[in-house]
Amino acid sequence: MTKSVTVKDLKERLNLELICSETGLERPISTSDLSRPGLELTGFFSYYPEDRVQLFGMTEISFSEGMEPEERLKRYKQMCTKRTPAFVISRNLEVPKELVAAAKEADIPVLRSRLKTTRLSVYITNYLESRLAPVISMHGVLVDIYGLGVLITGSSGVGKSETALELVKRGHRLVADDNVEIRQEDEMTLIGSSPAIIEHLLEIRGLGIINVMTLFGAGAVRSSKKITIVVHLENWDPDKHYDRVGLDQEKTKIFDMDIPKITVPVRPGRNLSVIIEVAAMNFRLKNMGYNAAEQFTQDLNNLIGHNSSMND
């Protein structure tokens, strides 16, 4: 599932000035890639990425000013296709009247920004990548624990929401409960958020639906968070081997990314919120270069080696 973006959305997000063709603001934008139509101004249209936002900077405008008006109008008309979303001019540069005429005829919006071309390009690309990123929904709870986005998964009734409530009481922040919308902003980033209709809400069996922001304040929630680790809760299986040292690192795949995963068995008497809290701290410590399990194994091997040499 992908979210649609219109030229109007881009205009409002970046506070762009509309030069012409207001009725074309509902044109869809289908890609985050931008085009700098320098070669097109010379007449090269063998490859013209017509579905991209066309960005004009100082180079393109300066080059076009050296062209004859008739040729300039011809080139701009060639750029105006049914799939072209919009033309964007940077640096508050003067918009060529031929571009305005061609855009009006094709009902393509012409927008202008005061930003420099490179910075404007970055802002547009980042915004479109965020909005056009592929999205999936996962059953689980997303909590911000010590700055880490922890996605808690598990079968229905295993205690995910109750654990999240305890984590909120311990000072952490709820992002989403029950249904987590996950979008892949780039090859290394997964962002989780809540559907608008259930944002800030927790469903607790026997208690019902509670509003976390109303009960605990604005500091207890956040709208989105990068997913760093997955904690999977499952009912204790006496026949299953669970990691007791921490040397093995499980992974789970979301989109095409491998996310670190910790499986926590659930049974009466285990304080899941504390376990997950410590798991987040331990994961952060590993990223800082210290692994308690590896250090223990190394110390144990050194001790065994020392005792063996003493016995020889």
Curated annotation (Swiss-Prot):
Span list, region Important for the catalytic mechanism of dephosphorylation: 265-270
Reaction(s) catalysed by this chain's protein: [HPr protein]-L-serine + ATP = [HPr protein]-O-phospho-L-serine + ADP + H(+); [HPr protein]-O-phospho-L-serine + phosphate + H(+) = [HPr protein]-L-serine + diphosphate
Cofactors that this protein relies on: Mg(2+)
Keyword Protease among UniProt keywords: no
Residues binding ATP, per UniProt: 154-161
Annotated region described as Important for the catalytic mechanism of both phosphorylation and dephosphorylation, given as residue ranges: 202-211
GO cellular component, as recorded: cytosol
Pfam families the UniProt entry points to: Hpr_kinase_C (PF07475), Hpr_kinase_N (PF02603)
Gene Ontology biological-process annotations: regulation of carbohydrate metabolic process
Functional note: Catalyzes the ATP- as well as the pyrophosphate-dependent phosphorylation of a specific serine residue in HPr, a phosphocarrier protein of the phosphoenolpyruvate-dependent sugar phosphotransferase system (PTS). HprK/P also catalyzes the pyrophosphate-producing, inorganic phosphate-dependent dephosphorylation (phosphorolysis) of seryl-phosphorylated HPr (P-Ser-HPr).
Domain notes: The Walker A ATP-binding motif also binds Pi and PPi.
Family to which this protein belongs: Belongs to the HPrK/P family.
Name listed for the protein in its UniProt record: HPr kinase/phosphorylase
Gene name linked to the record: hprK
